[in-house]
From Swiss-Prot:
GO terms for molecular function: ATP binding; ATP hydrolysis activity; ATP-dependent peptidase activity; metalloendopeptidase activity; zinc ion binding. This is ATP-dependent zinc metalloprotease FtsH 2. It comes from Alkaliphilus metalliredigens (strain QYMF). Keywords: ATP-binding, Cell membrane, Hydrolase, Membrane, Metal-binding, Metalloprotease, Nucleotide-binding, Protease, Transmembrane, Transmembrane helix, Zinc. Coiled coil: none annotated.
Length: 689
């Protein structure tokens, strides 16, 4: 259609130009005197007009000018002049045979010239419609193709082929989809056995965990066409477009079968039906209905598999998740420590790492990081190294990148008064000291009073191992840890500030969850309160259901207050009994501004004493010596662990070798026994003959 418009516009423009040339330049040019009527009238009366050609009220012909030269003329008879008088004069001149008069009918415009305005208006309308459709469809589709699918087809020859070897840290998830790949490679094996491969696989997990990447690996491993489309690409401004695009998508997929259709962010089109306050028809629901029909309508041997990804499975329509549609769900969560190490190895490729960079240590220090976070971490480390004009990425640079990813950009240039520095130091020291004194909190990784992001300072605690459950004691101690900053301000400065606002929000949230979600209240018992389900298009608070009475609501508030008050009292007790530790850490923060895990541990235990007159250049060498000793000890411990792992691996290899030899021996024995049996059978046959 676009080529047609280009060709048609060229020919139309050429036709108009040629017509203009013919109309204006096709006739020979001749000099004509333009006479007003009074001059023409005098010339007519004085016998100076020899020819007159009448066309309605205009007169053309030949006259004799003042130089006695015959020239062409043109004049116009005004309506106010009497035609009868002009007629009498002309008749008189004709009778005298001094004037030749001719007349012509009114000029008529050729039919094709009369059609030009209409044709021009039609062309303008077509061009306007074409531009309108281009804009409404994002400029990438053709006219009248708004009902076509926007899915992009990826084939083997397009770019780099991704396989399971390129996916790190998702061993269980890869195992879950291996049979899917086998079905795409060998579908007859399943069809002959009457087996049905899952028609739809739903990838569920937080953002950045690798759902899309894993799906690309499935397509690359199977070597089949891969259609990708976003859930928001179905519904647009025209009614019926969504359902039409779903039909077109499946028609394209059937032509390319076996293939994979990947719908990213399917919650955009697969939300629960009937949600919202309006009672009118929803275009999104029509699209969802068509998707449901298409998914449950194709045959078992067509080789079309739907893979979708979402981080909101709770809002998907139940009909979408039933067997026969998305009947298998693959949970793609954050990787564990082993998976993080594998992902770090992948993203460390092509980056020059210094010898002190230990990926195992980095994997332990990045709990909860998704693959996207780890990729961003290594990229930030490379950027920081380039900013420092260094050739290799050092361990301290990667640790700085970890802090930047978690807490934000460091703002050393911000001017802070001494009063606020002291307030921040005691606030963060309160968090750190309480975390150190408690037994079920994560170890302190870093404490700083340098502003980062929106925080004036922060205390970072990191777990030593991956956790999947949280106990009641851990939640209570976490509340105590969060209250450490507020309590330290009150005990030392005898005042409180707004710096604890975020801490208090988290305290209230944890305490409420303990009572209403996890049944950790002794008074209310093992019950949950409130309905977690709510309408997907409306506010949670607007549609949340209170399945309890007002009396129970008051008891819930009392239990929440009880948890918080008990934690506050414990925090006051801990800091009061360890006030000397609080002052030591706060003074160290005022001098050093940032304490890492080693420095905090050494100062807290008194291994390094910081005097009032000590300067940064006096303290830093002491810290460096102790840190070097600890790193050497960690390296020796890791070497010992690696040695033990190597021994275990050797044992496994020897066992496998022994099993293989035994299998070979058993197989040879069976073959020998079979040969003996064959010899006996042959001997018996000869005897019978």
């Amino acid at each position: 259609m676009r080529k047609f418009f280009r060709g048609a516009s060229f020919y139309i423009l050429a036709f108009i130009i040629i017509l203009f040339i013919v109309q204006n330049f096709g006739r020979p040019t001749q000099e004509i005197d333009e006479l007003d009527f009074s001059e023409f009238y005098r010339a007519l009366v004085n016998d100076r007009v020899t020819e007159a050609h009448l066309v309605e009220r205009s007169v053309e012909g030949i006259w004799v000018n003042n130089n006695n030269e015959e020239m062409s003329y043109r004049s116009f008879v005004p309506e106010v002049f009497s035609e009868e008088r002009l007629t009498l004069i002309i008749e008189e001149k004709i009778d005298q045979e001094g004037l030749r008069v001719s007349a012509a009918p009114p000029p008529t415009t050729p039919w094709f010239i009369e059609l030009l305005p209409s044709i021009f208006m039609v062309l303008i309308f077509i061009v306007f419609w074409f531009v309108f459709m281009q804009q409404s469809q994002g400029g990438g589709n053709r006219v009248m193709s708004f009902g076509k699918s926007k899915a992009k087809l990826h084939k083997d020859d397009e770019g780099k082929r991704i396989t399971f070897d390129d996916v790190a840290g998702l061993d269980e998830e890869k195992a879950e989809v291996e049979e899917l790949v086998d079905f795409l490679k060998n579908p007859k094996k399943y069809i002959e056995l009457g087996a049905r491969i899952p028609k739809g696989i739903l990838m569920i997990g937080p953002p950045g965990t690798g759902k899309t990447y894993l799906t690309k690996a499935v397509a690359g491993e199977a070597g089949v066409p891969f259609f990708s489309i976003s859930g928001s690409d179905f519904v647009e401004m025209f009614v019926g477009v969504g359902a039409s695009r779903v039909r077109d998508l499946f028609e394209q997929a059937k032509k390319s079968a076996p293939c994979i259709i990947f719908i990213d962010e399917i919650d955009a089109v697969g939300r629960k039906r009937g949600a919202g306050l309006g009672g009118g028809h929803d275009e999104r629901e029509q699209t969802l209905n068509q998707l449901l029909v298409e998914m449950d309508g194709f045959g078992i041997n067509e080789g079309i598999i739907i893979v979708a990804a979402t981080n909101r499975p709770d809002i998907l329509d139940p009909a979408l998740l039933r067997p026969g549609r998305f009947d298998r769900q693959v949970m793609v969560g954050a990787p564990d420590i082993k998976g993080r190490e594998q992902i770090l190895q992948v993203h460390a490729k092509g980056k020059p790492l210094d010898e002190d960079v230990n990926l195992k240590v980095l994997a332990r220090r990045t709990p909860g990081f998704t693959p996207a976070d780890i990729e961003n971490l290594m990229n930030e480390a490379a950027l920081l190294t380039a900013r420092k004009n260094e050739k290799k990425i050092k361990m301290e640079t990667v640790e700085e990148a970890i802090t930047k990813v978690i807490a934000g950009l460091e703002k050393k240039s911000r001017v802070i008064s001494e009063k606020e520095r002291k307030l921040t130091a005691y606030h963060e020291a309160g968090h750190a000291v309480v975390a150190k004194l408690l037994t079920h909190t994560d170890p302190v990784h870093q404490v700083t009073i340098i502003p980062r992001g929106r925080a004036g300072g922060f205390t970072m605690t990191l777990p030593t191992e991956d956790k999947y459950y949280v106990t009641k004691t851990e939640m209570q101690e976490h509340i105590v840890h969060l209250l450490g900053g507020r309590v330290a301000e009150k005990l030392v400065l005898h005042d409180i500030s707004t710096g604890a606002s975020n801490d208090l929000q988290r305290v209230s949230s944890i305490a409420r969850a303990m009572v209403t979600q996890y049944g950790m209240s002794d008074k209310l018992g093992s019950m949950t309160f409130g309905d977690g389900d709510s309408e997907v298009f409306l506010g949670r608070d607007f549609t949340s259901k209170h399945n309890y009475s007002e009396e129970v609501a008051a008891e819930i508030d009392q239990e929440i207050r009880k948890f918080v008050e008990e934690a506050y009292m414990l925090t006051e007790k801990l800091l009061t009994e360890n006030m000397d530790k609080l002052h030591v850490i706060a003074q160290a923060l005022l001098k050093l501004e940032t304490l890492d895990a080693d420095a905090f541990e050494m100062i807290f235990t008194g291994e390094i004493v910081i005097g009032k007159d000590d300067q940064l250049e006096d303290i830093q060498p002491k810290l460096n010596v102790v840190k070097a000793k600890k790193r050497a000890a960690e390296a020796a411990e890791e070497a010992e662990v690696a040695k033990e792992d190597a021994k275990k691996q050797d044992v496994k290899v020897s066992l496998k070798k022994q099993e293989k030899e035994e299998l070979i021996e058993v197989s040879s024995d069976k073959e020998e026994e079979k040969d003996n049996q064959d010899d006996q059978d042959n001997e018996e046959n000869r005897k019978e003959e």
